[in-house]
C-alpha cells in the first residue's frame, strides 16, 4: 500500500504516505492496492479512447464509465474491494469492445501504451493485490526522485478531482466531447509514467483549465434542472417527525428522494455538501425538505449515530459506520461503497423510505436556528455593482474567500479564528464544507449586504471565479489587483483540482492549509511559490495583516 492523496496521510521523517495495513481514512491496504490496479485499467481504457477518436469513434459508454470509475478511488468514497475489482473488469471489457471497434476500421490498429493490454491475473483478491504491486504510484521513486513523483501525483490527483466533477455533471445530462477527449488524453499519458518536470507542470495547468470547463457544464446542469440559487434561510435544528438524511453532492439523488418521499410523512434533511441544495428553487419547493443536520463530514460518526432515521451517501465523504453502530441504516449510492452496508443500485429509494417509516424520527421540534445559503452565480453577479459601490465609498475594504474542505486536524481551527477575525468592513465569501467551521456564527451586514456569503458547494468556486472576473472587468483591472484574498483549506482531490483551476487562470497569492499536501516536496512548494505566490498559512494575525496590506 502507498497512498498520499489526502490531508490526513501519515507523515514521518522517513517520508509521507499511508503504507501499512490500513490508511488513516480507514481504507485497507487491499482496497488501496486494488484501486491502483483499477487506475491502471482505466489508463489503458483511456489510451484506446484516444486511439478510437483518431478513427472518429466516440464510445459514449466508455466516456460515461471512465470518470465515474476513477471517482470511486477518491478519498472516502468506496472502501469495498469487490466493487473496485468489478470496475476494473468493466474497464477492461469496455476497452476490448473499443479495441474491436478500432480494428473494424483498421486491421492494424495498435495502441502504444503500457496499460493498453492489461489483463487481471485472477479472480482471487489476494492474487489481484499482488498484481497491483506493479502499479503502485511510488514504484520507481528511487529512479525518478521525489519531485517527479510529487508532480505525477499532483496531476493524477488533480485529474481525479476533475473526474468527480465530470460525473456530477454527467448525471445531470451534461456532456462535452472536447472535455472527454482531453480527459482521456491526460489519463492515458499518465499511464506512461512520465518523468519530464516541465511536461508534468504543463499537464497540471492543463488539468486546471479543463476543470474550469467541467465546472461550467456542471453549473449549467444544476441551474438548468433546478433553477438558479437565491438566498434562502435554512433551519439547522430538528423538526418533529420521521426523517431521512442525505449527504454528498448529487442534487439529482436529492430531487428523486424528495419526489418519492412527498406525501409519506417523512422529512428530509441535508448534510455536508448538500446544504447549498436549499437555495435551488426546484428543490426547496418541497416543503418536507425541512433543514440541514450536523456539521463537517469528519463528525459523522457521532452525528449519524444520533440521527433517528436512515442516511443516504451519494458521494464523498463516508467513514466507518460501524464505529457509531449505524451501519444497518446507512445506504450508499452510485460509486460510494462500504463493506456490508446496503447499496442502492438505481434511483428507487423505496427501501430507505420504508426504513424511515419504521423508525421513531425526532420526537419534538427544536427552537429553529436559521442560516442563509443560496448566493449562486446569478445572485453574486447581481450584487457586483453594489460591491463596487461599497468599495468606492470605502464601506467595503476587502473580500476574503475562506472555504474549501474540512477535516479533523486541530490546526483547522485556524479557519474559524480567521473568519471571526475578519474586520467589520470586510466580507467573507465561503464555499464547500470548510464553511462548517463558522457558518452558524453571526457576522452581521454592511449596509444590508450580509458579511458572510455562502456561494455553495466546492464546485461553485466557478461562481466565485466568474464574480472575480466580472468585478475586475468593471473596475478595469486584473483579478489579482482586486481587494480579494483567497484563504483555502484542502483535504482531498477535489480541492487539489480547484487549486489547479485557480492557478491555471493566473490567480496568485493564494494562502492554503492547514498543511501542504504530503506529495508536495520543498522544491515543488518553492516552484509554486515563485510562479504563483502560493504559500501556506502561518498565524491568523500575520496572515490577516499581510493580506490586508497587499
Curated annotation (Swiss-Prot):
Q: Which GO terms describe its molecular function?
A: 2 iron, 2 sulfur cluster binding; hydroxylamine reductase activity; metal ion binding; peroxidase activity
The organism of origin for this protein: Salmonella schwarzengrund (strain CVM19633)
Name what cofactor the protein needs.
[2Fe-2S] cluster; hybrid [4Fe-2O-2S] cluster
Can you quote the record's cofactor note?
Answer: Binds 1 [2Fe-2S] cluster.
- Pfam families of this UniProt entry? Prismane
Q: What does this chain do?
A: Catalyzes the reduction of hydroxylamine to form NH(3) and H(2)O.
Name the record gives this protein: Hydroxylamine reductase
Identify the keywords attached in UniProt to this record, alphabetized. 2Fe-2S, Cytoplasm, Iron, Iron-sulfur, Metal-binding, Oxidoreductase
Binding-site residues, hybrid [4Fe-2O-2S] cluster: 249, 273, 317, 405, 433, 458, 492, 494
Its signal peptide is none
Report the superkingdom from the record. Bacteria
What positions are modified (Cysteine persulfide)? 405
Task: Please tell me where this protein is predominantly located.
Answer: cytoplasm
| UniProt record similarity statement | Belongs to the HCP family.
Q: Where in the cell is it found?
A: Cytoplasm
Its EC number(s): 1.7.99.1
Q: Which GO terms describe its biological process?
A: response to hydrogen peroxide
One GO cellular component term noted in the UniProt record for this chain: cytoplasm
* Amino-acid positions noted as binding [2Fe-2S] cluster in the UniProt annotation, renumbered to this chain: 3, 6, 18, 25
**Cytoplasm among keywords:** yes
Concerning NCBIfam families, the annotation shows:
hybrid_clust, PRK05290.1
Task: Quote the catalytic activity from the record.
Answer: A + NH4(+) + H2O = hydroxylamine + AH2 + H(+)
